[in-house]
Amino acid sequence: MESPAFFFTIFLWCLLLSVTGYSVYVGFGPPSKDLRDPFDEHED
């Protein structure tokens, strides 16, 4: 249980989970009001 690979795996899992959570927060939370939509800016 104390091998470096175990702790490295846990670290990567936590890093991936936190980046995913932050991306969902920015994409759908309150900061999403500041995001621009390039499709709305484009005029045909």
From Swiss-Prot:
Organism encoding this protein: Oltmannsiellopsis viridis (Marine flagellate)
Residues annotated as transmembrane: 6-26
Function: May play a role in photosystem I and II biogenesis.
Compartment(s) where it occurs, according to its Swiss-Prot or TrEMBL record: Plastid, Chloroplast thylakoid membrane
UniProt entry keywords in alphabetical sequence: Chloroplast, Membrane, Plastid, Thylakoid, Transmembrane, Transmembrane helix
Any single Gene Ontology cellular-component annotation: chloroplast thylakoid membrane
Leader sequence residues: none
Protein's GO biological process: photosynthesis
Family: Belongs to the PsbN family.
Chief place where the protein resides: plastid
Protein name: Protein PsbN
Mode of membrane association: Single-pass membrane protein
Lineage, broadest ranks: Eukaryota, Viridiplantae, Chlorophyta, Ulvophyceae, Oltmannsiellopsidales
Protein encoded by which gene: psbN
